[in-house]
């Protein structure tokens, strides 16, 4: 397809600043500037917004890294890296931030440029960064193994972000589900002001695209979910199954402040990509996974309404936590010993040991529930009373006693049902697949594809 061209992948992560800015905004600037600098450039995928392990305590704000995939006339990797570094420097200079201030802040940005030949070998980096702990030292060893002729790391931007940068590049090597997100950016002079998005237009957009978009509004609370809330460049973001339906938002959703630019990203958001099958014995702190366990204890209520319950499989036992903000605690409180559930989540350290934080769960089997009471005395018909554990029952009226009588039991209908229990849209994290996406999964991405810059992104305000 690209005779005499070389394919390159640019990965970047942790370019957010606390006061403003985000890695996707940097990527938008980078896309346009690369197109200006290299006339032969062809974009062979939408920029990838790759969400990584949500359990990691030192994760970035949205825990999302970016990969840009291009074909162009062959050049030295260092030439492309230097161009990317200079463009990012220019981006920060536009906002009055010096490069040394970026790398000396609480952020640790990372930037890598990769030749296409080794990308298939980088899939394991993505899987580990998505589901486990991947340390920068391990990534650096891998990079050294690949060789500088295949991958180069920025000397200006070589912080912890190289983990996400390398992992985002590796995503393309894994056949997996994906979605798209259109991010619309605001003018810098409006960063300190409340976002001005017409809610009725969002509801209308949702009503005519709901079969191809998701998480636009939360019906129960009547809350709009597409707007960002921090001091950052994002005005709103809409998520869906294909780019064409997302572009309709630009014509339908009304805003009362300037739009500076927009970009469409292909992403692993809303796919449950991190929920890989695991046994209980394979769980470790900060690992993500999906486990199938039998409940072994009655629910207990912890601080803040958190429901704590124990479960086991053939390999071991684990404590599970269901939190109030996810609204799963109300359903978990109905579980009893013997129930079988499948739970997605991640492991966090507690003072009682590792605890599996449940993000969603399915009830696969319900144990029968009975309410039992002591039998009546066969002589005087008064109900027997229990004398203590292992001591049997006694009639207080006539003195009759029995060690192990048949109890009078009645079947109690369970309040919980078989099926999936998932948080409402307002409580969903980036990677969790919403109910609307079940049955719409994709299993392979057509790659490479040829895209014009105008299909991916557009700048409407020259200040970006």
From Swiss-Prot:
Places the protein is found: Cytoplasm
InterPro entries reported for this sequence: TiaS-like_TCKD (IPR053870), TiaS_FLD (IPR013696), tRNA_Ile2__agm2C_synt (IPR024913), Zn_ribbon_TiaS (IPR055394)
One GO cellular component term: cytoplasm
Keywords from the named record: ATP-binding, Cytoplasm, Ligase, Nucleotide-binding, tRNA processing
GO MF annotations in UniProt: ATP binding; ligase activity, forming carbon-nitrogen bonds
A Pfam family reported for this protein in Swiss-Prot or TrEMBL: TiaS_TCKD
Coiled-coil ranges (or none): none
Enzyme Commission number(s): 6.3.4.22
GO biological process: tRNA wobble cytosine modification
Reaction it catalyzes: cytidine(34) in tRNA(Ile2) + agmatine + ATP + H2O = 2-agmatinylcytidine(34) in tRNA(Ile2) + AMP + 2 phosphate + 2 H(+)
Record carries keyword Ligase: yes
Top-level taxon: Archaea
First-listed, main subcellular location of the protein, grouped into a coarse class: cytoplasm
Record bears the keyword ATP-binding: yes
Family: Belongs to the TiaS family.
Functional summary from the UniProt entry: ATP-dependent agmatine transferase that catalyzes the formation of 2-agmatinylcytidine (agm2C) at the wobble position (C34) of tRNA(Ile2), converting the codon specificity from AUG to AUA.
Protein's name in the database: tRNA(Ile2) 2-agmatinylcytidine synthetase TiaS
Protein species of origin: Ignisphaera aggregans (strain DSM 17230 / JCM 13409 / AQ1.S1)
